[in-house]
Amino acid sequence: VGTITRRHIKITEVKRGPETKIEGTTLYIREGIEAEVIADQELVKDFHLEIITPDQYHTYSETIMDVQPIATKEGDAILGEGATRVLDGVVMMLTGTDEGGVQIGEFGSSEGYLDENIMWGRPGCPDKGEIFIKGNIVVQEKTNMERRGPMAAHTAFDIITQEIREVMKELDDSFIVEDEELKSIRRPGKKKVVIVKEIMGQGAMHDNFILPVEPVGILGARANVDLGNVPVCVSPLEVLDGCIHALTCIGPASKEMSRHYWREPLVLEALHDEEVDLCGVVFVGSPQINAEKYYVSRRVGHTVEMMDVDGAFVTTEGFGNNHIDFASHIEQIGMRGIPVVGLSFCAVQ
């Protein structure tokens, strides 16, 4: 029912230079771009850009806020369709504090040495050998635990990613080292299943941007908190094409980073399993207040019931009060006679 083609561009070196460009397998990032990052958002007070190579992994870092693929749509292709260009060997990494030195997401932060805090080889994490384009943002004091602080940090940091995206769009096909096809295949007659992914929606740094114009972008996206955390149905290919820009804090609670959705293992497994018919993915936010949690979980139950599925997977990320609605989603689906399995992605403490 659909195909996206990931067009891979190999990067082996990242340097600073007078302009953002790609020459051979070297990515150059424009010197002075830091000033534009700071100027873009009133709440951003300082910004520092580092290029972390594998021999520098044992470097101290403020809390890691996100790990993002660098990808862009080709031509007029929209998210979840057509061709997507992606850089291999390099990722964007956002870190940050407020002006008082308080980590963004202090109660669940991950400051420390990068090589000691990164869980290598996981879908949302950097892979060993990759170069990190690491931006450390300082936001206005005491906005680190409000929605506007983390949102400003992510929005400002995307200026750099977007400049790289624009360069990628202009490259000729000689830069493409591999074309990878991801297919969404429906299998009538097999067990029809849906994946329900509970994402954070309590506010502050527990939020997500849904369906940006560019993979893991900012422009055009809506925050699920602003949507009331109600279920949003997307295609499996939209998930794998970067339809979620994760704003969640990352620390002991192990929320899912933007890159996790780009390589979402459950979606990939279900697409490849010839015994199941994956009809779609439902994203549902986890509100702060219990009454709102049950409001939302009832919507989940009705949504899944309307799909006439043979079974459902419900996933949540990390741990905390999101397990209240996680349990309620499972209950609401199960009480309608639909077999349901719950999965939780939790950290090593």
Residue ranges and their predicted role:
Residues 4-7, 279-280, 342-343:
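General beta-strand structural signal in soluble alpha/beta enzymes
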Residues 308-309, 313:
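Proline-aspartate-enriched helix->loop->beta-strand connector
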Residues 316-319:
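Structured, hydrophobic secondary-structure cores that serve as assembly/anchoring elements
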Residues 262-270, 296-305:
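Structured alpha-helical segments in the cores of large, soluble enzyme domains
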Residues 1-224:
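Long, compositionally biased, glycine/small-hydrophobic-enriched stretches that function as flexible linkers
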Residues 287-297, 303-307, 321-349:
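Internal alpha/beta domain cores that form substrate/cofactor-binding pockets in large enzymes
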Residues 188-287:
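Small-residue-enriched flexible segments
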